[in-house]
Each structure stands twice: as structure tokens, then as C-alpha cells.
Amino acid sequence: MALAYIGLGSNLSDNVDGHIVAPRAQLNKALDSLSLHRHTSLVTVSSFYQTPPIGPGEQADYINAAAKLETKLTPLQLLDYLQSIEQQQGRVRTIRWGARTLDLDILLYN
């Protein structure tokens, strides 16, 4: 199994089935999705941190965290899975460095 470190961030709420999902809940939901994949094991998760945004316009602060995974997925397979989680949680890619419901990045792989 490979080790992978994932960066997580969110500064937008999303409306899911009539319920508002706040940024902290977005991260928890993404961590749940990561732990459910049969080829991925969630090893540990950092604390959550509130950080100011870098980018265009007025944006809310981000909630950020990092997670350590063990995975049998290749880097490309892992990236595809992370992007599918982002899409499931309402991520729309419009403005570079803009506000987002969820941002998942591979920080380090093996």
C-alpha cells in the first residue's frame, strides 16, 4: 500500500436535500467518503484550522485539514476519486482560487 497525504478545504456551505451543509461538515463528509473506499484506509486526520482566503473577491475563511491515507490506488486513480467526492459535494469549478464547497488535493504520494 502507498501512503498519501490529502489536503482538505472548504469555505462554502451547500444545500443537500434541503439541509445546509457547512464547511466543517463538508470536510467530515469527505473524510467519511475517503474511509469508505475499499482500496483506501484513513490512517489519521489533523485538527481543523480556520484560515483566511487567498484569491479574488470577498470570500469567507476556509476550514482546512490534512489526512494521511494508505491506498492501493495509483495517483491518477486517487485524483479521480477525490474529484468525484468534490463533485458529489457540489463543487463547481468556475473561478480560479474562488470560493468552493470542497477542495481535495494530493499533497504527497509515497
Task: Label each PLM-derived region with a short phrase.
Residues 1-110:
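Core catalytic alpha/beta fold that binds nucleotide/phospho-ligands
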